[in-house]
């Protein structure tokens, strides 16, 4: 059975009022009521008896309520259902705000025909440890300004020195640092100690004052969203100001941006769900790229966990997937690593109209949009020589088809797929052999056959000669033989039955012998 909730005294109602007052000022309590209790305690101790009397009256009125089922209910963990529902609604509202913000950004850029000029900010943060109140102690931040047309426009990198760590977390911070970013922990940490200076650099870099009526949208990896939110909240609390930021998962923005760019160059959807964008970001094809990290991590050889390297790699992934749709020339060092070969990308832009090879109009015949390497590239595939690829298109590419019949080589086909090898065929009165009938050509051979020097069929046909005698039988016990010496010698090498007739030399050439198994 769950533990019965504690009685609600005056301090409980003071905590509720304290929480509402602080949240109206923009402060959040990720630690829940435990965090509210710790922060409200010092304020409660400063109240005199007259000020506490208000909350005592509220507690007394609550106890006098009828003890029926319409009172406050709690979960098995002792959390009020009203609080759970409130947090759920806040999360849904936040997701709706993120979706609406992304949609407005992209739609506005599309309507102004300036999608490639849309500027966004990518941010990453390394931390030393995580406290019991879900707060992260920052160690390093990195921020870049990016658009599709020019790639990485500007960079901001800053190491942060928190001076001291929360009590009891020094070992945890040291272990986490050694496993990831390898930055020295306090008291040996490097970087800026004044949070106000860090905040001012962020505001100046993002030109926050030019858009005071809106929340500043910052993109980051989905796993880093709580870290960035904690950092920005700490910066606001330290300077006692309320700057509005909206932290957006990068995969969500990447998905909607790709869907928008596809409409310019493709007639199909290659990003059906957000999962595709998340997989590409998680794959991180440029993870070990050198020359894009900060000086400290470059010297250390740990570019992978550098915050600056992360945000630059994210920009490379988005450029690699979206710029070609808009026929944007990729710039090495901004869209892709500085040592990347962009000549192939340049060749892919030189497209040809599918309707007229000589006079390209530069427009897709399906969507009336500019052609890209996805619609009709000039670089064609080398045709395969495989026997199983027999359906070819005009561009030289090969299409696999399960209905395609492989071409046969006549020389390798067997000579007698249906040829009988039993020499005991019966002969009728018209000297015709009862054998399966096959369609023959004018030269007497069956279609699809060729001469095989190792076949016994010719010799067996000679054994069955001649056909002008009145010899009948059931075939299995009947064999026509003559006294012809050449035929006897031929019969000896014919296989079965040769031993029965090797000594029959007295039979004339005009006579015949009938041997039958059913003879009485």
Curated annotation (Swiss-Prot):
It holds the Pfam family HMG_box_2. GO terms for molecular function: sequence-specific DNA binding. It comes from the Eukaryota. Residues 439-455 have a biased composition (Polar residues). CDD domains: HMG-box_MAEL. InterPro entries: HMG_box_dom, HMG_box_dom_sf, Maelstrom, Protein_maelstrom. Keywords: Cytoplasm, Developmental protein, Differentiation, DNA-binding, Meiosis, Nucleus, RNA-mediated gene silencing. Belongs to the maelstrom family. This is Protein maelstrom homolog. It comes from Aedes aegypti.
